[in-house]
Amino acid sequence: MEHQSDRIRDRAVPFAALVGGNIALALGPWLVRLSDSGPVSAGFWRIALAMPLLVLFARMSGEKLGHMSRATLLAVLGGGLLFGLDVASWHLGIGDTRLANAVLFGNSGSIILMVWSFVVLRRLPMGREWPAIMAALAGSAILLGRSLEISHANLVGDLFCLLAGLLYAGYLLILQDARKALGSWSLLALAGLASAPVLLGLALALGEPVWPTDWTPLLVLAFSSQIVGQGLLVYALRHFPPLVIGIGLLTQPAVGALVGWLVFDEVLLPLDMVGVVLVASALVLARVVTPRVRS
């Protein structure tokens, strides 16, 4: 009986980490809207405020921050640049579109990586890859069309979030080999070190207010997104296959839609729900069928 209890606990803890990590990340757009700095400035503080803890966790885990090859260093710098642009684009989109759309399109990197794999491997989609692509295209068309019906600003917000998904896919591809040489916390810390100046420079160029009057949303954003969300998912990824990770990802649009409805009166009509389900299904399928590719 005790052995069975231990086995249930061994499964429950990683599952709780998977769900908790996705919920923490899904609350990010809400906190960006609550911030009284600019959206790109909020991205800078999200990275900068989390840096000390990321470095501390890397050292506590025995990871070495300063020992890497030139190729790894260049990959980290390039990845950090793309990550900074990803955060900036996503945060700009969050302010204009609905939270459910922002979360879905912001996570579109999985689908983009799947399509990129076809280009690299020089082959057409097969099997379950076709339904993933068709669902992504159909769902995106529905959501983009609905945003255009609401306002042009909503459509622009969607496009910024889609651009963020594209940039995040590039970030993952560039850091593909660096992940072997660096631990998870070290990679997050070094990528953050490279992306923070990018975000600060963009915020200043856009004329955004950088210094907030209320630090609470930014402190919670940095802790929930960079520490709790990323940390829990790093832990959970070791315990589940891609299908379960993909299904866990569906927590994010559900939380985004709920917060959008309760806090910002964002109502999803039945057609919106069809679009959300199609894109969410595509995200799950993309995580299952995407082969590992080398850039």
Describe these PLM feature segments.
Residues 2, 47, 146, 214, ...:
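C-terminal-most transmembrane helix of multi-pass membrane proteins
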Residues 13-23, 45, 59, 64-89, ...:
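Loop-to-transmembrane-helix transition segments
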Residues 35, 42, 46, 77, ...:
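Hydrophobic/aromatic residues within transmembrane alpha-helices
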Residues 1-44, 78-81, 89, 150-177, ...:
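Glycine-/small-residue-enriched transmembrane alpha-helix faces in small-molecule transporters
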Residues 54, 58, 77, 83, ...:
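Hydrophobic transmembrane alpha-helices of multi-pass small-molecule transport proteins
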